[in-house]
């Protein structure tokens, strides 16, 4: 996916100005940026398309999974199998080991890690072409983060036609998930050659 001369303005604040968006299929495209740089606003703009930068097919084929894309916490996994209008993916069910989670317990009684796995299972089953992950490992324990990393790597390997954009400030996400690396700096989205370059930039070392 390639968008030229992309700008993002929220209110009177210019977050990105005449930059390029170039995200590769079959890769996890990581975006690092400091607070207030526009990471999450960029994700939302894929759907809102406020600047009319995206074609309608891009907006309609984009899925955002984040802290604000929550599932009803009164439901169980069994409930989702009954009420979700789209087909739930057996592949994702297996990759995330959903069977290890009690399917009769309401989401509000599950751990944060279990909730995140169920969210990924249900929402990724929508089978969208562009998947934006916004801080999805935030506040999760180390074991769950490792399991989600493994899942994402397997998922993109199995679906080379999809684009994954991972917005994160978690250094382990950037270091352990192989992909492309971008930083938001001076209102530009700049590609850097490696995870180490991205991390050094984020830590202010270059």
Regions found by a protein language model. Name each.
Residues 188-206:
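Conserved beta-strand-loop-alpha-helix hinge in the C-terminal portion
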Residues 43-86:
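ABC ATPase nucleotide-binding domain signature region
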Residues 161-167, 170-176:
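Conserved H-loop
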């Amino acid at each position: 996916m390639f968008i030229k001369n992309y700008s993002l303005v929220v209110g009177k604040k210019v977050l990105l100005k005449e930059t390029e968006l170039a995200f590769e299929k079959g890769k996890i495209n990581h975006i690092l940026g400091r607070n207030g740089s526009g990471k999450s606003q960029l994700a939302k703009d894929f759907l809102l398309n406020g600047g009319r930068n995206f074609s309608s097919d891009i907006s309609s084929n984009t899925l955002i999974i984040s802290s604000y894309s929550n599932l009803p916490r009164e439901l169980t996994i069994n409930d989702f199998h009954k009420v979700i209008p789209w087909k739930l993916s057996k592949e994702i069910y297996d990759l995330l080991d959903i069977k290890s989670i009690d399917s009769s317990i309401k989401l509000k009684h599950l751990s944060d890690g279990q909730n995140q796995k169920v969210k990924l299972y249900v929402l990724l089953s929508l089978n969208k072409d562009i998947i934006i992950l916004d801080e999805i490992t935030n506040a999760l324990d180390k074991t769950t983060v490792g399991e989600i990393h493994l899942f994402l790597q397997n998922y993109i390997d199995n679906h080379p036609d999809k684009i994954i954009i991972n917005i994160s400030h978690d250094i382990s996400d950037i270091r352990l998930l192989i992909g492309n690396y971008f930083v938001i700096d001076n209102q530009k989205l700049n590609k850097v050659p490696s995870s180490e370059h991205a991390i050094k930039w984020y830590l202010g070392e270059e």
